[in-house]
Each structure stands twice: as structure tokens, then as C-alpha cells.
UniProtKB/Swiss-Prot annotation:
<feature type="site" description="Transition state stabilizer">
    <location>
        <position position="18"/>
    </location>
</feature>
<feature type="binding site">
    <location>
        <position position="99"/>
    </location>
    <ligand>
        <name>ATP</name>
    </ligand>
</feature>
<dbReference type="InterPro" id="IPR001980">
    <property type="entry name" value="PPAT"/>
</dbReference>
<feature type="binding site">
    <location>
        <position position="74"/>
    </location>
    <ligand>
        <name>substrate</name>
    </ligand>
</feature>
<dbReference type="Pfam" id="PF01467">
    <property type="entry name" value="CTP_transf_like"/>
</dbReference>
<dbReference type="GO" id="GO:0042802">
    <property type="term" value="F:identical protein binding"/>
</dbReference>
<feature type="binding site">
    <location>
        <position position="42"/>
    </location>
    <ligand>
        <name>substrate</name>
    </ligand>
</feature>
<dbReference type="GO" id="GO:0005524">
    <property type="term" value="F:ATP binding"/>
</dbReference>
<keyword id="KW-0173">Coenzyme A biosynthesis</keyword>
<keyword id="KW-0808">Transferase</keyword>
<protein>
    <recommendedName>
        <fullName>Phosphopantetheine adenylyltransferase</fullName>
        <ecNumber>2.7.7.3</ecNumber>
    </recommendedName>
</protein>
<comment type="function">
    <text>Reversibly transfers an adenylyl group from ATP to 4'-phosphopantetheine, yielding dephospho-CoA (dPCoA) and pyrophosphate. CoA is not a substrate for the enzyme.</text>
</comment>
<keyword id="KW-0547">Nucleotide-binding</keyword>
<keyword id="KW-0548">Nucleotidyltransferase</keyword>
<feature type="binding site">
    <location>
        <position position="10"/>
    </location>
    <ligand>
        <name>substrate</name>
    </ligand>
</feature>
<keyword id="KW-0067">ATP-binding</keyword>
<feature type="binding site">
    <location>
        <position position="18"/>
    </location>
    <ligand>
        <name>ATP</name>
    </ligand>
</feature>
Length: 159
């Protein structure tokens, strides 16, 4: 049986840090679903459809990645996708407490759902979508932190 994992997030937009995590996840699992949350309460810069398209382009080189948008409860989404693993990125110790709460709630809702925490490579450990957008808004150079297609889309949004 294939081991299916979900890497959920808002990915507004997807960064090279996210690509680092999903790339390493593809080496551990047979099939990785990059699950892009609608997250309307976060007021994303990019629509769900735009985020899905950007992520599909940025992960096209990874043969066992599927990009899907969702707005369901994570445990329900995982059950519907026949996935038993959630991949979560941890940039800093500060992320751990919140991630632990999520992991426990998800396990309560779906006991067979395991959370696997991956640290980004050192090069990406300090970046987030929010930080990249903020730097770009102030004309800072963010080309190193984003896939090329995402960088172009971000610059177009900010123009």
C-alpha cells in the first residue's frame, strides 16, 4: 500500500522553503499532496486558484506531488484523500507549541493521522510567505526566496 502524506498550508505564496520541505517529503513518502487551504480569514494576496496554479508550476519537476486546494477540516480532508501522515514545517522553537496543539487535535479527530515535523534547510529557516511579501512591498529583492514563476506573479500583484 502506498504511503500518502499531506503537506498543508496557505502557501500565499509558495516559497523556496516550502519547496525544500515538499521535495524532502517526496523522498519519504510515495505520494505527497500539497494541500492549499482556502484560508479566507487570512485575507490571502493570491486567490486559491492562483496559489494552486503557482504551486503546480513550482512543483512540476516532482513526479509524486499532487497540488490540491481545500477548505475542509484537515482531518476530514486527510480521510477523504486516504492519507495517514501530515507534514508540517517547523522554522523555530516558537512554531512547536502551536503545531503540537494541531497534531493532538488532528489525532483526536482521526487517530490514524500522524504528524511529521520537518525543519527547513538552514538557508530557508528564517523565511515565511508573510515576510517575503512584506520585503517585496518595500522593493526589497526576494528573488532568492521564491521560485521564478512565483516571483513574477508576486511582482505583478504588487505593480
Amino acid at each position: 500500500m502506498q504511503k500518502r502524506a499531506i503537506y498543508p498550508g496557505t502557501f500565499d505564496p509558495i516559497t523556496n522553503g516550502h519547496i525544500d520541505i515538499v521535495t524532502r517529503a517526496t523522498q519519504m513518502f510515495d505520494h505527497v499532496i500539497l494541500a492549499i487551504a482556502a484560508s479566507p480569514s487570512k485575507k490571502p494576496m493570491f486567490t486559491l486558484e492562483e496559489r494552486v496554479a503557482l504551486a503546480q508550476q513550482a512543483t512540476a519537476h516532482l513526479g509524486n506531488v499532487e497540488v490540491v486546494g481545500f477548505s475542509d477540516l484537515m482531518a476530514n480532508f486527510a480521510r477523504n484523500q486516504h492519507a495517514t501522515v501530515l507534514i508540517r514545517g517547523l522554522r523555530a522553537v516558537a512554531d512547536f507549541e502551536y503545531e503540537m496543539q494541531l497534531a493532538h487535535m488532528n489525532r483526536h479527530l482521526m487517530p490514524e493521522l500522524e504528524s511529521v515535523f520537518l525543519m527547513p534547510s538552514k538557508e530557508w529557516s528564517f523565511i515565511s510567505s508573510s515576510l517575503v511579501k512584506e520585503v517585496a512591498r518595500h522593493q526589497g529583492d526576494v528573488t532568492h526566496f521564491l521560485p521564478e514563476n512565483v516571483h513574477q506573479a508576486l511582482m505583478a500583484k504588487l505593480a
